[in-house]
């Protein structure tokens, strides 16, 4: 039948063999798997459940069981008269041998990786053939967000501040939400980036830019869409009123006193200059008045002598 599948002696491809098998068998064997995706955390073990209903007198020698990736047809695990594994899953897959005879064809996948995510098909052949596919979703919870503030000191109302929310080692990509202190969503001035590391896990950095008020609380929520888990982080910022330290206050007082003294000195100098100028003008005016009176006194005798001469002439 399907003996030897997955081994080096296979002469035809698995897809061709399964196609021939589908044509030859009636499909009376019924394979059942979970309709809901199987969710597994990174680095934990996952069980992909698959079952069939064995007929009375069933023997494992009649069973051919194959697990493979649905899309690529890559072999994951097989059971014919033993097991054969694909290299990508070496030492990481196992069946439940003691339960096979009861119709339990489930696959145990150990130490789940991000790259294990996908659809897996369970093929069961006894005398008839059937198959079914089950989905595996891989997830990893995000760490509690760390909040950083830039600038982080000497903040005043009206300052533009940058708040960064960082969460690490999650999968799949996160959904990030910002809220203010009243629980209202903040969607403007938000920039979010997500980068996968070598294991495929994401580091999230979301940046919010806001104008600081008198005080405010800002919350960051990082949601894992598969696990429906939320990681919260928040920061409360208080904008301090403008104050001066004691040193600055003394410097300000000293400068003010110096400025007052300088203005007083300047006013005194100006007053002295103005006073001196006024005194000089007054002195000049007095000198001019004195010169005028002297001239008048000198002229008076001359007039008197002239009168005498005139008188003399008349007498003569």
Curated annotation (Swiss-Prot):
Segments for region (Disordered): 281-316
Where is the chain membrane-spanning?
A: 249-269
This protein's source sits in the domain of life called Eukaryota
Compositional bias (Acidic residues): 281-292
Localized where? Membrane
| Any one annotated GO CC term | external side of plasma membrane
Q: Which residues form the Ig-like V-type domain?
A: 29-139
| Gene3D superfamilies, A to Z | Immunoglobulins
Name the InterPro entries on file.
BTN3A2-like_Ig-C, CD276_IgV, Ig-like_dom, Ig-like_dom_sf, Ig-like_fold, Ig_sub, Ig_sub2, Ig_V-set
Q: Does the keyword Transport apply?
A: no
- Which residue intervals are topologically Extracellular? 29-248
Record's function text: Modulates T-cell-mediated immune responses and the development of acute and chronic transplant rejection. May play a positive regulatory role in bone formation and has a dual role in the bone-immune interface. Induces antitumor immunity as it activates both acquired and innate immunity leading to natural killer cell and CD8 T-cell dependent killing of tumor cells.
SUBUNIT field = Interacts with TREML2 and this interaction enhances T-cell activation.
Q: Can you tell me which family this protein belongs to? A: Belongs to the immunoglobulin superfamily. BTN/MOG family.
Please identify the protein, giving its name as recorded.
CD276 antigen
Q: Which organism is this protein's natural source?
A: Rattus norvegicus
Q: What is the lineage of its organism?
A: Eukaryota, Metazoa, Chordata, Craniata, Vertebrata
Q: Which gene encodes it?
A: Cd276
